[in-house]
Regions:
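Substrate-recognition/cap regions that form aromatic- and gly/pro-loop-enriched pockets
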Residues: 324-325, 329-456
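A contiguous strand-loop segment
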Residues: 2-134, 154-293
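Glycine-rich, aromatic-lined ligand/substrate-binding cores of catalytic
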Residues: 231-368
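Histidine-centered catalytic/metal-binding microenvironments
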Residues: 436-507
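Short, well-ordered beta-strand elements within core beta-sheets of diverse protein domains
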Residues: 138-144
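Short, charged, surface-exposed loops that flank catalytic or proteolytic processing sites
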Residues: 144-150
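Short Pro/Gly-enriched beta-strand edge/turn motifs at strand-loop
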Residues: 60-66, 152, 334-342
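Soluble extracytoplasmic regions of secretory-pathway and membrane proteins
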Residues: 21-34, 96, 181-183, 319-330, ...
Length: 507
């Protein structure tokens, strides 16, 4: 999926949490309805069948309960996207990545190839099963992962066995660590631990820019990889490090150069997003003019950086909702020219489907440690709401999305708000910002109050109480969301082209 990701290490976050956040964006012209779901062990398949690749995978018989954000429309797979399991392990999958021709030749993607002809007849060629993809990964890994590292190991084993038909980045988190895995070609992969004091920005482009092969093959303190990565790189001459003696890759090399891309489309679609996110979190750097440290089209924007101050939930929401505010590239702005205002792909885009922020709080007890912040629709116009993840059910307002457009659930209400407010962006802006600030404030208070209420309960009673708290908060969110919908509908209705000032009846 054409998504955007930010990862925040525990010492870089405002409260010591590990934070994993990703927009799930549909393809251009597609708007995929989303909902929330809790998957119980008896609902998890023991034999998984992929819709897109026709792959069948036998799964262990001991899955855990987990949260997910699946597609609503049936027929093309689950696409569970993001969630927590019972052990407070988080997973977000996937961020579609880029690669290059050398990698594609060295380890081709494992595409599904339909059968040719009719079985039993001359010339019949059976279908070729494809590999894993975004459709599958959360369902295949999250119910079984005991830690972030374990999630990397499980997915790595699956990739080496079955391969993949697309280039993807996947995040795993627990209360101590965040790991980022990038697939390389059809069967290879690398994974790197996010530094505790840093954040990571990921547009749809292979991102890791330094990798220690010795660590990955040894202690695995900060790096992991597929078993034959070194020999495979040597055979295909993939490392581009200058001055390396012998045939093998450098012990520390740049994966972005070896496996990634620097295409013209990257400079329109990908690098500007990393540039703007880091501009927000490290504002003292020089971002504009001839002396800029980095420009929107720079190929060397760092994968990870230490922020100038600790990063909050609101910072994450802002950068993942952004459309280059304050620059000549803002599609809603007045700076620059019409050409500059449409030059780069926004992060907050019309086809944002959902945003999941996975927060694991070290100061909270395991029974209520995991909070999954959620937003639906275009991020420029929506608000994040917190949900405790250790629950048996999700509130109907978030879970009962249907294909029918209605204001009765959170997904469609936000889609309607975005479509209406976009038309009169500046006139609706104050109401949208008030809504976002109010709902965000309500969310932080909700967490504080519920934490205190649940702290004294036996651990076994926590899920039911957390579910009640989620439901009560969903009803408050519904009231505020309905009110915003009414405001933007009124504002946009008043500005319709067929309006006329003369009346014949005044109430």
């Amino acid at each position: 999926m054409p998504c955007t990701t930010i990862l925040v290490g525990k010492n870089a976050s405002y409260d010591g949490s590990t934070l994993v956040a990703r927009n799930e964006d549909s393809s251009n012209g597609v708007f995929e309805p989303k909902r929330m779901r809790v998957v119980h062990p008896d609902e998890q398949p023991r034999v998984y069948a992929s819709v897109l690749s026709h792959l069948t995978v036998e799964l262990p018989d001991n899955p855990m309960r987990y949260t997910s954000v699946p597609d609503v429309i049936p027929g093309h797979g689950i696409w569970a996207e993001a969630g927590f399991n019972e052990l407070n392990v988080g997973m977000s999958a996937t961020e579609t990545l880029t690669t290059n021709e050398r990698v594609r030749g060295a380890d081709p993607l494992v595409d599904y190839v339909p059968a040719k002809g009719n079985e039993g007849e001359d010339g019949y060629v059976p279908a070729q099963t494809g590999g894993l993809g975004e459709e599958d990964m959360v369902t295949l890994v999250l119910p079984y992962a005991k830690s972030a590292r374990d999630g990397v190991r499980i997915l790595g084993d699956l990739l080496e066995r079955y391969g993949t038909y697309e280039n993807n980045g996947i995040a795993f988190s627990d209360v101590d660590e965040i790991w980022w895995l990038e697939t390389i070609g059809g069967h290879h992969w690398i994974a790197k631990r996010v530094p505790d004091d840093a954040y990571v920005t990921m547009p749809n482009q292979l991102g890791i820019d330094s990798f220690d092969l010795d660590d990955a093959e040894g202690a695995q303190v900060d790096h992991m990889c597929s078993a034959d990565l070194r020999s495979w790189m040597a055979e295909w001459h993939l490392d581009l490090t200058l001055g390396v003696e012998g045939d093998g890759p450098a012990a520390v090399f740049n994966p972005r150069e070896a496996f990634g891309s620097h295409s013209d489309s990257d400079h329109v679609y990908n690098t500007p997003r990393a540039w703007y996110m880091q501009r927000c979190l490290n504002p003292s750097d020089v971002w504009d003019g001839p002396d800029a440290d980095y420009t929107p089209e720079s190929d060397d924007i760092p994968w990870s950086r230490v922020p100038e101050r600790k990063v909050t939930i609101e910072d994450i929401k802002y950068v993942l909702s952004s459309h280059y505010q304050g620059t000549e590239y803002d599609c809603y702005g007045s700076k620059g020219t019409p050409a500059t205002r449409g030059a780069y792909r926004p992060i907050g885009i019309n086809r944002n489907g959902q945003l999941a922020v996975l927060q694991l709080r070290p100061y909270a007890q395991p029974a209520y440690r995991a909070v999954q912040w959620m937003a639906f629709g275009s991020n420029s116009f929506n608000a994040l709401v917190p949900l405790y993840a250790n629950v048996e059910t999700m509130p109907e307002y978030y879970a009962d999305t249907q294909t029918r457009v209605t204001s009765e659930n959170f997904y469609w209400a936000n889609r309607l708000i975005g479509a209406l407010a976009d038309v009169r962006f500046h006139e609706c802006g104050r109401a949208v910002e008030d809504y976002q600030e109010k709902v965000g404030g309500m969310g932080h208070k909700q967490i504080h109050d519920v934490d205190a209420a649940v702290a004294a309960l036996p651990e076994a009673e926590a899920p039911a109480e957390l579910a009640r708290a989620n439901e009560a908060f969903a009803q408050l969110v519904r009231v505020e969301t309905d009110a915003l919908l009414g405001k933007v509908l009124y504002t946009t209705s008043c500005a319709m082209k067929n309006s006329f000032a003369m009346n014949d009846n005044v109430r």
